[in-house]
Regions:
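Sec-exported extracytoplasmic/periplasmic mature domains
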Residues: 41, 45, 78-82, 105, ...
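CBM-like carbohydrate-recognition segments
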Residues: 65, 279-282, 300-419
Length: 419
């Protein structure tokens, strides 16, 4: 709004103190994505690392660093690029990839790589997964962009590349060299994931020491979905059957162990991807159940928990494809579409309680620093790069699919008591 305008604020309820968004449409969702992604752009430092985050009440910097969260945040920058086509965003993503490859990529042998956490002296399964996602998404956009920011390195593959960013006049040869090199790195990371997979059970080991010995067999369920999704994206990139074969092993374990109980958005991403290539009723059913059996919990959750909208929106994309490709699926009769769509609308509105509007930011020590970002209210209004990332992911998919959501019956508005 123009300076001097009076903006009415919601007087009570969960959304007390923020402006009411009368029409949370595609344009509104786009504005939240671009604002939050612009915040992330400002966090990219000269060496490609991010300013990790803040506790903004007292403008305290969050200590430490997490390379896995760094990798997944690159994905959010690329969502911004898909919307705005700003070349500077692609360059920032390139710089951020360079940082990881220079500081955190480790090789067990010439064909097997991992993303390490140097400050923790450990290797996480999920780290390799999200770095594959960042690389494959970046390569997708480079193939669409006529003059991308190229990362070039003459280092041998057995060493972490020391890349530099430049704009090439002769784009096509450089672009092809980039694609080959980054495909090699992504495949080496994929082999790292496979080294942590039990092919008999489909279970992953989660954390290694820096000498590649096992540190923790299990840490968090998120790693499983990240790894399976990454294997599926490697299949999309290379068309090598082995990636899909082993992704199937992991997904079979998700079904056998009923991973719907975890309400995991990464599992939703993995199922959305694998059902593009493997057409089985049990896979389609599980992909839909992963959201359906959790709708009551997602609908009633009062916090802004940032991965829930991602889970719902990824499942929406899966639902649409199943409806077109497998309309006879028996579970479609059990899938409560109106409740599902209503839950999406409620969660999208609930997420706004975590957006740093000016009326929230003004209470923080340095409002300008966190304006337009997303926060975690129940942890001191924390603003961390991965918090912003997940909010961008959910709203980007909401923006992308908004017209289809309305066409299938999502309400434009929700009752005020649900705000």
């Amino acid at each position: 709004p123009a300076s001097g305008c009076v903006i009415p604020l919601i007087p009570d309820g969960l959304s007390r103190g923020r402006r009411e968004i009368q029409n949370l449409d595609a344009a509104a969702a786009r504005s939240f994505v671009t604002a939050a992604a612009s915040f992330l752009e400002k966090q990219v430092q000269q060496d490609g690392s991010f300013r990790y985050g803040y506790y903004p009440r007292f403008d305290r910097v969050i200590p430490g660093y997490n390379c896995m969260r760094h990798a997944s945040t690159i994905w959010s920058l690329l969502c911004q690029y898909r919307i705005t086509q700003k070349a500077s965003v692609l360059s920032l993503a390139a710089r951020s990839i360079k940082y990881l490859l220079s500081h955190a990529l480790v090789y067990r042998d010439p064909d097997t790589a991992y993303l390490s956490e140097p400050l923790k002296d450990e290797i996480k399964l999920g780290g390799g997964g999200v770095l594959i996602l960042a690389i494959t998404e970046y390569l997708d956009l480079c193939s669409e962009e006529p003059r991308p920011a190229i990362l070039r390195s003459r280092e041998p593959l057995t060493k972490a590349p020391n890349a530099e960013i430049f704009h090439a006049k002769d784009v096509l040869p450089e672009q092809e060299a980039l694609r080959r090199r980054y495909t090699e790195i992504a495949c080496a990371l994929g082999n790292g994931i496979l080294s942590l997979l039990n092919p008999e059970t489909g279970e992953f080991s989660h954390v290694l020491n820096m000498d590649f010995s096992l540190k923790e067999r299990y840490r968090t369920v998120y790693y499983d979905g990240e790894a399976a999704y990454a294997l599926c994206r490697l299949y999309r990139l290379t068309k090598e059957e082995k990636w899909l074969f082993y992704a199937k092993k992991a997904v079979d374990h998700f079904l056998a162990a009923d991973y719907t109980r975890y309400r995991d958005h990464w599992v939703a991403y993995a199922m959305n991807e694998i059902t593009r290539y493997i057409h089985r009723d049990d896979y389609d059913t599980f992909a839909l159940r992963n959201a359906r059996v959790n709708l009551d919990f997602l609908y009633k959750r009062e916090t802004t928990y940032h991965t829930f909208l991602e889970l719902l929106m990824v499942t929406f994309e899966t639902y649409e494809r199943i409806l077109a490709e497998n309309p006879g699926l028996p579970y479609l009769k059990e899938f409560d579409l109106p409740y599902f769509l209503r839950t999406i609308r409620v969660r999208a509105d609930r997420m706004l309680n975590g957006f740093f509007f000016p009326e929230y930011a003004m209470y923080m020590r340095c409002p300008d620093k966190i304006l337009g970002s997303f926060m975690v209210r129940h942890d001191g209004f924390r603003v961390r790069i991965d918090d912003v990332q997940h909010n961008i992911g959910g709203f980007y998919l909401y923006y992308k699919n908004y017209s289809r959501l309305l066409a299938l019956g999502m309400p434009k508005d929700i009752p005020c008591e649900e705000n």
